[in-house]
Amino acid sequence: MSLTVEIVATKPYEGQKPGTSGLRKKVKVFTQPNYTENFVQAILEANGAALAGSTLVVGGDGRFYCKEAAELIVRLSAANGVSKLLVGQNGILSTPAVSSLIRHNKALGGIVLTASHNPGGPENDFGIKFNCENGGPAPDAFTNHIYKITTEIKEYKLVRNLQIDISKVGVTSFDIAGKPFTVEVIDSVANYVRHMEEIFDFAKLKDFVSGKATGKPLKMRIDAMNGVTGSYVREIFLNRLGATESSVVHTTPLPDFGGLHPDPNLTYAKDLVDTVAQGDYDIGAAFDGDGDRNMIIGSKAFFVTPSDSLAVIAHYLEAIPYFQKNGVQGFARSMPTASAVDLVGRKLGKEVFEVPTGWKYFGNLMDAGRLCLCGEESFGTGSNHIREKDGIWAVLAWISVMQHTGKGIEDILKQHWSVYGRNYFTRYDYEECASDPCNEMVATMEKTITAPEFVGKSYSSGGKTYKVKEADNFSYTDPVDKSVATKQGLRIVFEDGSRIVVRLSGTGSSGATVRLYIDSYEKENVLGQASVMLKPLIDIALEISQLPKFTGRNAPTVIT
């Protein structure tokens, strides 16, 4: 029986402008009449003529409204000329798995249902983003096109009576107004696990994890935080690498993440940190809701900053078979990320790129063959195996480094610092501040730091003096396509390489989040306590930015 396409009249909603990684709003916003339909229709239309006969991947992190949205996307895609959908079972796919599937199946792109590390549940957040045919987040030009369509939309297309059960793996074919349309519901983890087996030496890692190679099993604590990674964690760490059941926790994806805030940092992954601090563990790791972020801690909860994690993996990349085979190209980091990887790149003779915040900025460099490893201070690490950051990949990389060196995490870091020096780093987040005063703060600070007399000025605190070398509102010209991104964050660089960065974040769903980044480099004094080493620069940053005055906050919501 041929199913018919229905054209439904609609009106634009204000504010459907995708941020750094898609559109994130409260569930109550997405469930307004036609709200999700409008945005998905805009995504489909933005693909233009390429949409007809195409294959798309659909899946998300399992948060509240994920399954309903996935089923809605099936009905909209059928009506808009898509030929085939690959849908994760129950609508579940990690963001790295979507990227891998797009590339493996040469799909036109993927619609990812996630608000990443933001809380889930009926009162919390939902999100939709589009990944392009390279597997990476849509670039600015594409998301701007989506937004333009949302402001002008008058109708969307729907096959209302298309029935599909996405809880069962299998292929279902339909006739949509005389054209074939196929929905393949796939095992959420199979393709991704195969991909990891191609990158890492699972046999060697299994011998290391089980203790067969060393006589002592690797004691790990992997916390999926009730996000999408649960089933991936169980298949890889338990079934493939032979870890014990007690090595993994919170591995059932839940619509509200079991009340957890799936953001892998010292504040929200406190349960993991406390457990590893008090127990006998070699490595602890946590992931966010959609599986692209990771936090690594060593024995007794020794914290590895994301910038140090990136630098250490860069130093040991050739311990991973994928890089032995494909070679090591350049490295990159987001601008606010401490510059530890720059020092590794310099030593190894590799290009190092500094890009704006947002994983999409790494994609062009990867596609051009100039970049194979990159990371962000916001707990994102990844390589050119896909075009997204990848939490599980990062943990497998760390276990590979531990196996290769025969050392624990703290010793690996101390050896690294003895060679390269140490970037002490912290980030202060002031969440859900009033937007207008925050914008005024940034404007005032920009005026201060771009005044001609600011460069050369010295600031002193806690017995340390820092002299300003340069200061600006960071802008970036893509070396590949020459596109320009401006106003990416205020930064002050001092003569010793230390830095202060202030940004307003675009990933929250309400209010503004002010992020203050402090990066202090020490060549010799590498074993100090981070909070003590950073305090002078933090005090200077609060003085220059006048942050307490504008936000009304005397302390950050989160310290990382």
From Swiss-Prot:
Localized primarily to fat bodies in third instar larvae. Disruption phenotype: RNAi-mediated knockdown is lethal. Glial-specific RNAi-mediated knockdown is viable but eclosed adults present with locomotor defects. Neuronal-specific RNAi-mediated knockdown is viable with no defects. One of its GO terms (molecular function) is phosphoglucomutase activity. The keyword Phosphoprotein applies. Its EC number is 5.4.2.2. GO terms for cellular component: cytosol. Pfam families: PGM1_C_vert_fung (PF24947), PGM_PMM_I (PF02878), PGM_PMM_II (PF02879), PGM_PMM_III (PF02880). Gene3D superfamilies: Alpha-D-Glucose-1,6-Bisphosphate, subunit A, domain 3, Alpha-D-phosphohexomutase, C-terminal domain. The keyword Transmembrane helix does not apply. Changing residue 346 to K: In strain: dpf95_90.2, hfl97_1.0, hfl97_13.0, hfl97_15.0, hfl97_50.0, md90_709.1, zim_36H and zim_39H. It comes from the Eukaryota. Its cofactor is Mg(2+). It catalyses: alpha-D-glucose 1-phosphate = alpha-D-glucose 6-phosphate; O-phospho-L-seryl-[protein] + alpha-D-glucose 1-phosphate = alpha-D-glucose 1,6-bisphosphate + L-seryl-[protein]; alpha-D-glucose 1,6-bisphosphate + L-seryl-[protein] = O-phospho-L-seryl-[protein] + alpha-D-glucose 6-phosphate. Belongs to the phosphohexose mutase family. Monomer. This is Phosphoglucomutase 1. It comes from Drosophila melanogaster. The lineage of its organism: Eukaryota, Metazoa, Ecdysozoa, Arthropoda, Hexapoda.
